[in-house]
Amino acid sequence: MKICAINGSPRKRGNTARLLSWALDGVKNAREDAETELINLYDLSFTGCRSCFSCKRVNGPSYGRCAVKDDLAPVLGKLADADGVILGSPVYFMGLSGMMRCFLERWLYPYLVYDAARSSIAPKRMATAMFYTMNVTEEQAGEAGLPALLRPMENFVERIFTRPYVLWCYDTLQFRDYSDYVAPVFDEAHKQQHREECFPMDLKEAFEVGHHMALGELREFDEHAREHHHHDHDHEHEHHHDHDHEHAHGHDHH
């Protein structure tokens, strides 16, 4: 079994990279013989789709695979026979990082068929997951419509492979020392507290994603998580006004 994690963040020790590392630890926890690899996109020199259409040419030598020869080519070769792929990206300007977007164009497009059946010619319908890290809170992300903006790419991943498990990591600690940067909108004390209280749970969830992916149980885990999140969301909504009242004079989260 081979499972790869794709880091779409420029930082190798940041929030996104840590989540991916924990996910791969979960893979190893489930199956010691599993082969895992963390690939940092920002170490590679590549572009998005070049629109050469070699992957679509009838009887062409590169039909169904990207013909561009650059640093991403061997990565795409590795992924072709992987059993699972975990994608991680920070949210930049309400979307994926540029490198992650470029990667997805190159990875997905060769397998997409222009037919009425919306066919996929991917070698495997492998398990997939997408991890998002962001500065905003869950409430702010919802108000801004972020889930709807990211969902189209999730749908393409599902069309080509399988429905991805989606992990949302909100309100991240962006700087080690906020006094070194001009960012007065953020409350560092709140950010630190949120990291101490919530980030360990995000890491645990990432670990569980890798664990269940390795066992072939990711879909069941995803369905259970969705049901649990829906229940928690309804419960939080019941006490929303009390929560707002308690924090009316507290930290500014915006």
What spans do the regions from the language model cover?
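N-terminal beta1-alpha1-beta2 submodule of the flavodoxin-like/Rossmannoid cofactor-binding fold
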Residues: 1-116, 185-232, 237, 249-254
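Cofactor-binding loop segments of dinucleotide-utilizing enzymes, especially the Rossmann-like FAD-
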Residues: 8, 41, 131-133, 169
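Short aromatic-enriched loop/helix-cap "lid" or pocket-rim segments at secondary-structure transitions
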Residues: 48-52, 141-143, 176-181
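Short, catalytically relevant binding-site loops at active-site mouths
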Residues: 92-94, 136-137, 173
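Short, glycine-/small-residue-rich phosphate/pyrophosphate-handling segment
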Residues: 99, 111-167
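The feature marks non-catalytic terminal segments
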Residues: 160, 180-188
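Beta-strand-loop-alpha "switch" segments that mediate conformational coupling across diverse proteins
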Residues: 165-176
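Long, intrinsically disordered low-complexity tandem-repeat segments
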Residues: 243-245
